[in-house]
């Protein structure tokens, strides 16, 4: 995707399935074009994505991405912004 975008992984099947959150976050980053970012919105049930998702993304993508924790949403979920470098 050659634009900045967001994906919501915070409701329904994601709330109790951390593996699904990680798998779909990896897929979202893969679909993001070089030079753009995806805001990955994660469930409140798993807490701050820096504690579980950031490590998984770094293990998969290495230096091809940069990440920044943005904030906790008013709805309770969390936003992790992931930039695709190449």
Q: Predicted segment positions?
A:
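Generic structural motif recognizing short loop/turn segments at the entrances and edges of beta-strands
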Residues: 1-7, 36-37, 63-65, 76-78
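An N-terminal amphipathic alpha-helical segment
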Residues: 1-34
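Surface-exposed beta-strand edges and their flanking turn/coil or helix-capping segments
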Residues: 21-24, 53-55, 80-82
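Short, hydrophobic/π-rich interface segment
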Residues: 27-69
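C-terminal edge-of-domain segments
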Residues: 59-86
């Amino acid at each position: 995707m050659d634009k900045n975008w967001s994906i919501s992984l915070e409701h329904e099947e994601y709330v109790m399935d951390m593996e699904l959150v990680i798998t779909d976050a990896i897929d979202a980053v893969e679909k993001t074009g070089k030079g753009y970012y995806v805001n990955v919105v994660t469930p409140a049930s798993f807490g701050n994505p820096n504690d579980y998702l950031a490590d998984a993304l770094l293990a998969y993508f290495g230096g091809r991405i940069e990440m920044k924790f943005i904030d906790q949403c008013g709805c309770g979920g969390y936003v992790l912004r992931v930039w695709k470098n190449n």
